[in-house]
């Protein structure tokens, strides 16, 4: 039986500002990525998100980003790799404290937004992320863009397990990278198209690029975004589509 992980970015509310559909999404995913206060989230939200995830027996990962609350961590920052290391180490440590306090064990690390996209093509950034994981807990898994040589090489260097990730609602360029959110066709808003793309990736191992060419993708985890208008409905549909197609949903080991 084919097995796939469904992950979602949660814990992105901040103070009085609520973001996402965390409670409704949790029953339909197998792992979550919790914002750690730099691009979103705050200490109370982090604690609450961890506790809810444990109630649902969902694998918990840190979702470190650039220190950019206003830009939601989606703007590139020109910082040295040493600072990226500090940012990532700091955020993993913060979330790990909440996970341990709740009696749990952290499962993985997935960079957020611009940090993720930069790491996918910049070996120095990817190396800094992997080094931070290695120094704090080398047993943590690293979620990174499928086929990214930068992620692959960094994980191999520090002997960290890389979980190759694909996206349900994002379009792909010919080189296998994600279409920038600054472009109009970056997001797949039609549910049928998104579900078709997911099944192609999971069952057939490829995705159609924006140019119509087939790009090989061997995904071990699929990211669902939890902050869209139809996010909950979409999560339910993908969950049931996988069940209907005999695809088991489980966090990677």
UniProtKB/Swiss-Prot annotation:
InterPro entries noted in UniProt: Glyco_hydro/deAcase_b/a-brl, LamB/YcsF/PxpA-like
Cross-referenced Pfam families: LamB_YcsF
Reaction catalysis annotation: 5-oxo-L-proline + ATP + 2 H2O = L-glutamate + ADP + phosphate + H(+)
Disulfide bonds: none
Function noted in UniProt: Catalyzes the cleavage of 5-oxoproline to form L-glutamate coupled to the hydrolysis of ATP to ADP and inorganic phosphate.
Organism of provenance: Bacillus cereus (strain AH187)
Keyword ATP-binding appears in the UniProt entry: yes
Subunit structure: Forms a complex composed of PxpA, PxpB and PxpC.
This protein's name: 5-oxoprolinase subunit A
GO molecular function annotations of the record: 5-oxoprolinase (ATP-hydrolyzing) activity; ATP binding
Family per similarity comment: Belongs to the LamB/PxpA family.
NCBIfam families referenced in this protein's UniProt entry, alphabetically: PRK05406.1-2, PRK05406.1-3, PRK05406.1-5
Keyword Nucleotide-binding on entry: yes
Name of the gene encoding the protein in the UniProt record: pxpA
Enzyme Commission number(s) from the entry: 3.5.2.9
Keywords: ATP-binding, Hydrolase, Nucleotide-binding
One of the GO BP terms on file: carbohydrate metabolic process
